[in-house]
Amino acid sequence: MITTVGEISARRKTIILASCCLSLLIVSMDSTIVNVAIPPAIRTDLHATASQMQWVIDIYTLVLASLLMLSGATGDRFGRRRIFQIGLATFAVGSLLCSLAPDIDTLIGARLVQGFGGSMMNPVALSIISQIFVGRVERARALGLWGAVVGISMALGPIVGGFLIEAISWRAVFWINLPSARPPSSSRRSSSPESKSATMRDIDPVGQLLAVLALFGVVFVLIEGPGMGWTNPRILAIAAGAAVALLAFLRYESRRHDPFIDLRFFRSVPFSSATVIAVCAFAAWGGLPLHDVAVPAGGSAAIRQPTPV
């Protein structure tokens, strides 16, 4: 039997909102909680190089960002609750693999699995909230709480991560995801009714593939370039491939009726400015722990902080 929105009690709506916010909390917190584990716990235990430490942080957020829109469109087409629960299970499996990783390469691969699962949770959970809370006031409150959780989770990450590392081990920063990931999928009360979009958007696999190739190419060059050398043939080839993918993406999306990303948004100065500011802020947020590794002992005490201030 399909439950309609009108049949959902206020109590169940609250439980669903809490479940969606919890999923956002663990996904967003995982983008910062690992930062404090990099220097020096993971580096020492798994004998990681500078580039490998960067991949531990970047592969998660890269996969998460690359697949957000695809996951949202998939949820609209095949069912939001179904995709959300698949993402939750995938994220939990990735977290378990991270905690058991015997070497740095396995940890990087497990972080990729985490990012894949997280990409299915956040956009679909937001769609579920918008679907459940139909009233103008209650939807505004629900989305306001959803946005607040983002800031709270990113602030909690370094604090919780530092405590777990000191008290237990760096592996504990991944254990915390396992009990947190269980309630939304295991409780019927916290499960939202299955829903799909009335108007199906095209998934746009070509645009998605070009975007992923461009992003991965740029990140690979930035991470591996200093170690391999900027004139290394492999670096030059990947940089050229990323540039071609980016140009092809811009050309393809500008001519598509239902694009993966509507490029007209970037004509808006406020939108473009906010995007640039967000990119710079997150780059600084993720880069500070890695910079801490490079600063020699006795260096600037103001810079040698394991977490952003």
Model-identified regions with their sequence ranges:
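Flexible interhelical linker loops that connect adjacent transmembrane helices
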Residues: 6-7, 14, 185-212, 254-269
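C-terminal membrane-cytosol helix-exit motif in multi-pass small-molecule transporters
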Residues: 126, 178-197, 212-224, 240-256
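Transmembrane-helix bundle of Major Facilitator Superfamily
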Residues: 2-190
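Cytoplasmic-side transmembrane-helix entry/capping segments in multi-pass membrane proteins
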Residues: 86, 138-150, 200-210, 235, ...
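Short helix-capping/hinge motifs at transmembrane helix termini and TM-loop junctions
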Residues: 71-72, 101-102, 134, 191-194, ...
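12-transmembrane solute porter fold
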Residues: 15-29, 34-36, 47-50, 167, ...
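A membrane-interface helix-boundary motif in multi-pass transporters
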Residues: 166-178, 223-235, 303-306
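Hydrophobic/aromatic residues in alpha-helical transmembrane segments
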Residues: 34, 58, 71, 109, ...
